Amino acid sequence: MELHEIAHARAKAWIEEMVALCAPDTVYVCDGSKKEYDTIMQKMVDAGLATPLKKRKNCFLFRSQPSDVARVEARTFIASKREDDAGPTNHWTDPAELKKTMTGLYSQCMKGRTMYVIPFSMGPVGSPISKNGIEITDSEYVVCNMHIMTRVGTRVLEALGTDGEFVPCLHSVGKPLGPGVTDAGQWPCADMERKYISHFPEERLVWSFGSGYGGNALLGKKCFALRIASVLARDEGWLAEHMLILKITNPAGKTKYIGAAFPSACGKTNLAMMIPTLPGWKVETVGDDIAWMKFGKDGRLYAINPEAGFFGVAPGTSDFSNKNAMDSIKENAIFTNCGLTEDGDVWWEGIGYPAKGTIIDWHGVSRPAPTRDKSPKGEEIAHPNARFTAPARQCPAIASNWEDPEGVPIDAFLFGGRRPSTVPLVHQARDWNHGVFLGSIIGSEVTAAVISDQVGQIRRDPFAMLPFCGYHMADYFSHWIKLGSQARAENLPKIFCVNWFRKDAEGNFLWPGYGDNSRVLAWIFDRCDGVDNAVETAIGWMPKEGALNTEGLNVSTQAVKELLSVDIAGWKKEIKDIRENHYPKFGARLPQQLRDALEVLEARINGSEGAACTRDMC
């Protein structure tokens, strides 16, 4: 399709305006075909940017610049009209000033390059929960990744018609080329101080400049699907969440759907693709990262995965930790900043086996292959944030209804962080507002391996949305409370807090995790059916003695008791930290319901309310 053939007048006018600003050599409107993908990928191979992998069919390896390896939160802006609306957790800048600065950067930024126009749908095309966008980019890497991560092409333009709503997303690597000049194998990006990932919430607009990395450049992902979509969800009465969606079926053939929000490094993708150790139980994947949810006609929350692929962290992914992910990336995948073995395969730390002979690291330097699947810190073969991009349909565990345009009905929400102490293996909120409270306080404890002067402190990441909420986080809490108040309690998902990362006094994990997390999911499954397998404690409902299936589990009775106990001293410290360090950040906009929940927790912990007490729980 040619630009002049686009029937949507507003989209066409915007694209033409961006062509005049960015001055590309040519303009190409993406049709979403396999031929298009193959042609553009070959262009990158010819330019020395992509390396075909001999061991994997239709797979390619890319290496970025060391300055362009991850999301850059310090260069990520929420440019709301009022600073207060961005809130304390976002970087705000004046939208008029930001546009002026970025317009200067965009001026002729695509000289020597092709401007690609990518019509894309977040979610199945035509779904009542889906939204459309158009990304303009000068990066072939972005085009090919968007082919995998979203639904791209002519069918999206057809769905838009002549006046459909869309989110405009402008992206440039910020590296124009002179006559006859190519990238010559060098990943194109701008210097750090010229990188901008900017969101204009009231305009539903994303502008990104200077980075080619996934989260900064694949604008359908965090920029649209979370930061802009969270604003849309607030205004339209739905939820856009940093959540996996899994389908779980018990031995009797009954199915439920669970949404789970965890901060980074807490095993979200592993849980979404889990292979249960409990006989007869089955877990299937609907999504591993983002969930969009709207209330259905029956009053229940229905969720879609707005993405079409997985953009996963490679290091640590192995047949042991996530076999389904490993099977998903055997073909038709893109790898970024991984090692390259001498026989033409990718490799990373934690892959489960050593490489042989020599290996090329993510810097492009040839080195002796490690004798184990580990490397000293700072000498990694693969960057710690090395990534794979793969179509979701290739996952062996993908649910047959993962693309149902009506979504799947959510029965439970899980919140959790990486907490070596205090927070038990699982507990259930007493009601919706208590669940919102639990979501608002999740986080991970800083360990000695991270930042030494903060050891023991809790790095809070409410709802795992800290880097992704497009407006004031306190208003986000209020939005959750409001949605709960508008629904019948029996229609709302039950809310649970989980913690796979409790440790004993010697620093050893008490819980094996991975497939054995199915034991916790089985208890949650039964709780959603109202099974009487819980006891009320000071912090919420917890498994009765013997309610958690530990058959065949190599965990001592004492460890299980510790995992399912309420640490009174730990919770008193937790309450103090929330009251003094966490909640004050949100000021007067913090919902009173959350202040009340904290008071109730303190009263229960102090024993002033007669919570039922068993097994040293309270």
Curated annotation (Swiss-Prot):
GO function terms (MF aspect): GTP binding; manganese ion binding; phosphoenolpyruvate carboxykinase (GTP) activity
NCBIfam families per record: PRK04210.1
Family of the protein in this entry: Belongs to the phosphoenolpyruvate carboxykinase [GTP] family.
Residues holding GTP: A265, C266, G267, K268, T269, N270, R387, R418, Y514, G515, D516, N517
Protein encoded by which gene: pckG
Pfam family, one: PEPCK_N
Assigned EC number: 4.1.1.32
GO cellular component: cytosol
SUPFAM superfamilies: PEP carboxykinase N-terminal domain, PEP carboxykinase-like
Record protein name field: Phosphoenolpyruvate carboxykinase [GTP]
Active site positions, chain numbering: C266
Co-factor(s): Mn(2+)
Species name: Treponema pallidum (strain Nichols)
Sorted UniProt keywords: Cytoplasm, Decarboxylase, Gluconeogenesis, GTP-binding, Lyase, Manganese, Metal-binding, Nucleotide-binding
Co-factor note (free text): Binds 1 Mn(2+) ion per subunit.
